[in-house]
Amino acid sequence: MNHFPKLLSSQIGFDVAQTMLENFDRHYRIFREAAVDAKTLYERADWHGLQRLARERITSYDDRVQECVEVLQDEYDAENIDDEVWQQIKLHYIGLLTSHRQPECAETFFNSVCCKILHRSYFSNDFIFVRPAISTEYLENDEPAAKPTYRAYYPGTDGLAATLERIVTNFQLEPPFEDLTRDIGCVMQAITDEFGEFDAAPNFQIHVLSSLFFRNKSAYIVGRIINADRVLPFAVPIRHVRPGLLALDTLLLRRDLLQIIFSFSHSYFLVDMGVPSAYVEFLCTIMPGKPKAEIYTSVGLQKQGKNLFYRDLLHHLSHSSDRFIIAPGIKGLVMLVFTLPSFPYVFKIIKDHFPPPKETTREQIMEKYQLVKRHDRLGRMADTLEYSSVALPISRLDHALVRELEKEVPSLLEYEDGNLVIKHLYIERRMIPLNLYLQNGTDAEIEHGVKEYGNAVKELMKANIFPGDMLYKNFGVTRHGRVVFYDYDEIEYLTDCNVRRVPPPRNEEDELSGEPWYTVGPHDIFPETYGPFLLGDPRVRAVFMKHHADFFEASLWQASKDKLLQGELPDFFPYDVSLRFSVRYPDRFDATPDAGDGDSAGNAQRAA
């Protein structure tokens, strides 16, 4: 039954709707400006500036929502607007969105503002956008000066090499390329290596998204090759190979490699999108099966991703019958974790009380999760979705889980109309806990898991992250085989840690003591003491010492800390370095002039 009013008679309703949309438009303008600034910072190789920009953009959305709430409270006394007017506000807002190019994001912004003003009893489709109201299908920016979402190129006309060069140069990057002809040759060789010689069909074409995707020290060209009935995804990372010179680093042609680049364990891209839904639709065609929620999140629209995820959860609950259960594995001291077996995510709640030796607070743990959200995750830390007032049907909760919730988090629970409302929780992708992966794995799987674990921790330390609790149970294995850290309550910046060696025992009593004979400060770390916790299984020990014997040396950790303190930002690659053109085709690079060679300027080609 439709409860909406027949007439839109409220001027306040229209004014509030218009004010909310104006505030959203301001938010999205700032969002796009960040992507434009990212291109400038990338061209200057200002990596610290790019990091700062990415951090600031993450908090920008909440700032704009709060500004809008304050305006509505000050100018319209929003909390006291009656129900009929609130319904009209939504209808007016829908009317204002009919020609909008980011309607789905504007609807989410509307929800965010309303959730700050209205009681949760109003969280229905009468008052907020539980379901989308405006279609985003075939949405494009048709203004004459606007860039299309993607450009189509036809190699049959000019040849593949010339087409590839035009694709790169159309992005008009300011620094010249070290040797673009060489790089295009590498791209063509990689295509041949992957597919062999293939016959060009009449519809042979290449589609390329019109904006670059910026993250870390790379700018990615993302597109698809169409040939007959085949759709082949690709991404080309562009990197600074030496001061003032660019190069195409590799060509990623496999769908699984693109899915890793757009993974939940990586930081969000900075990408300028006039019509974000069109970008997401394009990305869905090259990564079928990847949820739209994750794609929206990966391109920096994490609130839209969060909104879509919640809709996916509600949809799944209405089309499934299994129960939420306590997550398998070792129970944590700080978090209560549960899952729905038919849904590939885990739900994490901060407990009301923590047993010794944990010395922390709810506020400190929430700040750790925010630290991870703001930090460069490098594909090694799981992203989290943070929710308030999540209502789950009591009938879908296992009895053991309900007892555990009532025991561990009573302050966060409310019973309401057959639902259990959880006041605060985090949601993450479900992974195989690394301790179980190693415990049950074959020799090959153990070697892979241990090698990945060491690589993950080493990459995190280079990114200024000390995990705190190094146990395998705090790491997970993704469906792509990547080892990812997901327990953040003890996380610290490595630069805040004091890396120490264990001093030699003073006497035999010290040597036999089960307690440290030396003082340990709150930020002291002793890498050589990690062995007993990580190397108990002989099979694990053998491969750990084969690949990561230096893991337990304080000098490794101190060297990373020293470089960070000197302002160095190391290179990270979300793909195996063996795929880099310089590694894959070394003969093509042997003749490249050195940066100091007088011929280098002649070989440099400007992408303009």
Curated annotation (Swiss-Prot):
Family membership noted in the UniProt record: Belongs to the AceK family.
Location of the protein in the cell: Cytoplasm
Protein origin, superkingdom: Bacteria
Chain segments annotated as transmembrane: none
Active site: D383
Annotated binding of ATP, by residue: A327, P328, G329, I330, K331, G332, L333, K348
GO cellular component, one term: cytoplasm
EC number: 2.7.11.5, 3.1.3.-
Key words, A-Z: ATP-binding, Cytoplasm, Glyoxylate bypass, Hydrolase, Kinase, Nucleotide-binding, Protein phosphatase, Serine/threonine-protein kinase, Transferase, Tricarboxylic acid cycle
Any one GO molecular function term: ATP binding
Function according to Swiss-Prot or TrEMBL: Bifunctional enzyme which can phosphorylate or dephosphorylate isocitrate dehydrogenase (IDH) on a specific serine residue. This is a regulatory mechanism which enables bacteria to bypass the Krebs cycle via the glyoxylate shunt in response to the source of carbon. When bacteria are grown on glucose, IDH is fully active and unphosphorylated, but when grown on acetate or ethanol, the activity of IDH declines drastically concomitant with its phosphorylation.
Recorded catalytic activity of this chain's protein: L-seryl-[isocitrate dehydrogenase] + ATP = O-phospho-L-seryl-[isocitrate dehydrogenase] + ADP + H(+)
GO BP annotations listed: glucose metabolic process; glyoxylate cycle; tricarboxylic acid cycle
Primary subcellular site in the record, as a coarse category: cytoplasm
Protein name: Isocitrate dehydrogenase kinase/phosphatase
UniProt cross-references to Pfam families, sorted A to Z: AceK_kinase, AceK_regulatory
Organismal lineage: Bacteria, Pseudomonadati, Pseudomonadota, Betaproteobacteria, Burkholderiales
